[in-house]
Amino acid sequence: MPLLSVSTSIEINKKNLFLKNCSQLVSKLTNKSEQYVMVRLFDQTPTYFNMDQSPSCFIDFKSIGSLNPSEMSKEISIFISNQIGIPINRIYICFE
């Protein structure tokens, strides 16, 4: 079961839509049915990253099977930036 945990310092106003869009992205990236995908969101989480508290996002991506961080990082970063406006250089992704 793929799990995407998103922790961000900003408030996400349309949480349900964001969660749905994340679930669809994870399904696409892992080639697994969306019925097995779990997405967790932690917004308004105080975060200190790169020596300041500017808007940022931490992504923890877990899945049994193959994850390809070098290919997935760019797509996830662009997705997050487009969805919630976090600059790509303020997104940190951990793959397990």
For each feature predicted by the language model, list its residue ranges.
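Interaction-mediating elements
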Residues: 1-96
